[in-house]
């Protein structure tokens, strides 16, 4: 990506915000080196990885990345034989613990059923070095000191040191407390100079204690003397301290060598936790800006739903739907300055850069974005003063560079294209520049305030006009993007609300051509139609969501009903079996008594009569089958099934009608208001509804056959619309019409594309085209019939 593009789209500001969510310098280095990728597979994997980290945050709130530091230089020094300090070794131990803890954290979530395949692969690379970690922490305390327990020898040496220090202090304190010494000492304290214990003696008594003078006060009146009686003890103390230092160095060298042996593993672990820190920083940032994972496609179109700029407060900014690349490859946003056009432009650019960097973007779920090899942006004139160039010249230098490099894999963003020069020439240049980049197949978003470009949006198939809505009542932009509606200046309305007289405004209107007035009125009507369509869509969307909610609730109730029914049936069966078993036992007892009576000759009963009696008892008991859930046949119904057949769905015990076969073993079935997939093994054939006999219909050719010259499909569902188009074209041919119009509206373009795809295949169609400005523009297709 060009450095200028990253700068004008404020990519580095996004990275600055991302830095705030890293846990270590390792993660910060990753963020600082972050640049957008152009590799499709890599971008998809990065998005999936960020999504997994976001799932962890949703479930756990955080990730255990504390205590991790950049130990790479220390490990490399250990590898070449340098001795590491206690704090450096402690950092290594803490980082090894942090990596081990992170590995355990992710693996525990996976063991509990959370699907994290990518993060699981990452932590699988972490090798536990628990033994080395414990060796270091057993030798070095939290404060970075080598502890007594590091070795038996060190413990013994430090015992000697403490004993020597105690004896020295005892002798010196006795001296300072002596009444004879009070007049000779400047102060009754024991202090240290040059790592040896001394007492402060007045200058005139320097010869009383003998020993060694180590220091004197600033005035020279006090000498810090090591008395002769403790010189040997101080010497012994110093020798012990030397031994302590040697033992500490031996321990540190031993630990350093242990680190050197595992250096490659330690460095590998560090790289993994650096990546994990970076990954979770992206996930935390996504949570901060309320971003979601986009669907990444490789088909050069984007569909950003409720897109917001990440650097603007989400509570303040107005989200917009932005589509580019399917029905049109270029959006020309027209309208007055300070209307929010540039924010929309930057939103598109920064969302693409973020997505290609593996960052989630501030849009609604199911938004799609594509991968661009190059992103070019001509926004602002921040360099014009430095380069002593005019606004127009600075823009043109950049545009020339863009035209040299832009191709079908490029996204091009123009802000106020053609500005800074004569309006007529600027508009002409803008049109030529747009034609050039459009012809190369690039995806383009351009802003302009030139009215000439409004007509440009109507005259090019792959270009669509757009504007940012302006509220005349509040005299301020709403920042809502209106796709398909060109912008207008609103100068007359604003002037009127600000108090300008109607007479002056009417005179001003007379200075504008009739065509211009017609265009402005047409734009105003388009704006109103757009608002109405959007309102209708919102109402339909609300009804759809309500319907889906009711559908889910009904399905839930059906499942609960079946579960409760099965549970009650199972309970009843169990109770019945218990009663039958009790009856059998009672019968066995009776038979046994009869046998005993016969043996005692108290009854004359034959064996076959006993067996027959028991058989009658068992036959009287109903055969019960334990049932935990509804059993269905494993074989398909014997009757060959066809669409339209009535069947019984065994799971629900309900009748339904077959709609279509969706696989070798499954059908789509309509059960009341529900439509669901059902396996053939779970249904029972009932009957095939009788077909009503189709009667021949006489047709009349000519003007007496009443067929409208227009077919209005607005508001129709796609399947119904296609069926109406087929019938309408047949009727129009029967009526011998040479030309008809199909009104499909602009909308998302799906219906328009479906109509035109059908027309291409229809044998009765000679040619077709979009409507002219007076015929409905892109919202109408005019069809010439053979």
UniProtKB/Swiss-Prot annotation:
PROSITE patterns: DNA_MISMATCH_REPAIR_2, SMR. SUPFAM superfamilies: DNA repair protein MutS, domain III, P-loop containing nucleoside triphosphate hydrolases, SMR domain-like. GO terms for molecular function: ATP binding; ATP hydrolysis activity; ATP-dependent DNA damage sensor activity; endonuclease activity; mismatched DNA binding; ribosomal large subunit binding; rRNA binding. Gene3D superfamilies: 1.10.1420.10, 3.30.1370.110, P-loop containing nucleotide triphosphate hydrolases. Pfam families: MSSS, MutS_V, Smr. CDD domains: ABC_MutS2, ATP-synt_Fo_b. It comes from the Bacteria. ATP binds at residues 335-342. Keywords: ATP-binding, DNA-binding, Endonuclease, Hydrolase, Nuclease, Nucleotide-binding, RNA-binding, rRNA-binding. Residues 711-786 form the Smr domain. InterPro entries: DNA_mismatch_repair_MutS_C (IPR000432), DNA_mismatch_repair_MutS_core (IPR007696), DNA_mismatch_repair_MutS_sf (IPR036187), MSSS (IPR046893), MutS (IPR045076), MutS2 (IPR005747), P-loop_NTPase (IPR027417), Smr_dom (IPR002625). One of its GO terms (biological process) is mismatch repair. Its EC number is 3.1.-.-, 3.6.4.-. Homodimer. Binds to stalled ribosomes, contacting rRNA. Belongs to the DNA mismatch repair MutS family. MutS2 subfamily. Endonuclease that is involved in the suppression of homologous recombination and thus may have a key role in the control of bacterial genetic diversity. This is Endonuclease MutS2. It comes from Bacillus thuringiensis subsp. konkukian (strain 97-27).
């Amino acid at each position: 990506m060009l450095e200028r593009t990253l700068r004008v789209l404020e990519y580095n500001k996004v990275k600055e915000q991302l830095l705030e969510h890293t846990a270590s310098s390792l993660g910060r280095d990753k963020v600082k080196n972050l640049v957008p990728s152009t590799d499709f597979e890599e971008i998809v994997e990065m998005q999936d990885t960020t999504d997994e980290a976001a799932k962890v945050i949703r479930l756990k709130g955080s990730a255990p990345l504390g205590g991790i530091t950049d130990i790479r230089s220390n490990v490399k020094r250990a590898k070449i034989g340098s001795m590491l300090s206690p704090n450096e070794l402690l950092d290594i131990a803490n980082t090894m613990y942090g990596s081990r803890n992170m590995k355990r954290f992710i693996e525990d979530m996976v063991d509990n059923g959370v699907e994290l395949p990518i993060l699981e692969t990452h932590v699988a690379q972490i090798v536990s070095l628990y033994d080395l970690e414990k060796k270091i922490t057993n030798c070095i305390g939290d404060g970075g000191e080598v502890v007594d327990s590091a070795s038996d020898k060190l413990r013994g040496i430090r015992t000697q040191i403490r004993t020597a220090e105690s004896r020295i202090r005892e002798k010196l304190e006795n001296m300072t407390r002596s009444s004879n010494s009070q007049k000779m000492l400047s102060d009754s304290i024991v202090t240290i100079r040059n790592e040896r214990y001394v007492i402060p003696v007045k200058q005139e008594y320097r010869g009383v204690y003998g020993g060694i003078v180590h220091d004197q006060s600033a005035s020279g009146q006090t000498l810090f003397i090591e008395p002769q009686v403790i010189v040997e003890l101080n010497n012994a103390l110093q020798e012990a301290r030397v031994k302590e230092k040697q033992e500490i160095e031996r321990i540190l060298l031993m630990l350093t060598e242990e680190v050197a042996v595992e250096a490659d593993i330690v460095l590998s672990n560090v790289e993994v936790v650096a990546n994990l820190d970076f990954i979770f920083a992206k996930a935390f940032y996504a949570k901060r800006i309320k971003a979601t994972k986009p669907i990444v496609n490789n088909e050069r179109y984007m569909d950003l739903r409720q897109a917001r700029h990440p650097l603007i407060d989400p509570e303040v900014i107005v989200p917009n739907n932005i589509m580019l690349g399917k029905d049109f490859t270029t959006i020309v946003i027209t309208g007055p300055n300070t209307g929010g056009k540039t924010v929309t432009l930057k939103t598109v650019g920064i969302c693409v850069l973020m997505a290609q960097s593996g960052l989630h973007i501030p849009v609604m779920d199911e938004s799609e974005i594509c991968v661009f090899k190059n992103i070019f942006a001509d926004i602002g004139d921040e360099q014009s003063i430095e380069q002593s160039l005019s606004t127009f010249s600075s823009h043109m230098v950049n545009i020339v560079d863009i035209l040299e490099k832009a191709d079908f894999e490029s996204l091009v963003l123009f802000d106020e294209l053609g500005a800074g020069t004569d309006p007529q020439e600027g508009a002409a240049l803008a049109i030529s520049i747009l034609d050039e980049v459009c012809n190369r197949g690039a995806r383009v978003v351009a802003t302009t305030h030139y009215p000439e470009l409004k007509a440009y949006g109507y005259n090019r198939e792959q270009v669509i006009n757009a504007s940012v809505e302006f509220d005349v009542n509040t005299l301020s932009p709403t920042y809502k993007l209106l796709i398909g509606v060109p912008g207008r200046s609103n100068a007359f309305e604003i002037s009127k609300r600000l108090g300008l007289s109607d007479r002056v405004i009417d005179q001003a209107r007379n200075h504008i051509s009739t065509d211009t007035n017609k265009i402005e009125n047409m734009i105003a009507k388009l704006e109103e139609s757009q608002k109405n369509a959007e309102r209708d869509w919102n109402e339909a969307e609300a009804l759809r969501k309500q319907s889906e909610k009711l559908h889910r609730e009904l399905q839930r109730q059906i499942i609960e009903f079946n579960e409760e029914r099965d549970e009650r049936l199972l309970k009843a069966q169990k109770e019945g079996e218990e009663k039958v078993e009790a009856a059998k036992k009672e019968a066995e007892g009776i038979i046994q008594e009869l046998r005993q009576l016969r043996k005692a000759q108290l009854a004359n009963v034959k064996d076959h009569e006993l067996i027959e009696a028991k058989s009658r008892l068992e036959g009287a008991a109903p055969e019960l089958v334990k049932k935990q859930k509804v059993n269905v046949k494993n074989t398909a119904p014997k009757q060959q099934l066809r669409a339209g057949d009535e069947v019984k769905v065994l799971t629900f015990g309900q009748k339904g009608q077959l709609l279509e076969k969706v696989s070798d073993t499954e059908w789509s079935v309509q059960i009341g208001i529900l439509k669901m997939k059902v396996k053939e093994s779970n249904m029972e054939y009932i009957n095939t509804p009788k077909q009503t006999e189709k009667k021949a219909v006489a047709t009349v050719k000519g003007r007496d056959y009443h067929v409208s010259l227009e077919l209005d499909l607005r508001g129709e569902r796609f399947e119904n619309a296609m069926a109406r188009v087929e019938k309408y074209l047949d009727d129009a041919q029967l009526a011998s019409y040479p030309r008809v119009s199909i009104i499909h509206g602009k909308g998302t373009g799906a219906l328009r594309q479906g109509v035109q795809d059908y027309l291409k295949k229809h044998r009765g169609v000679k040619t077709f085209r979009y409507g002219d400005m007076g015929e409905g523009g892109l919202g109408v297709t005019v069809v010439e019939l053979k």
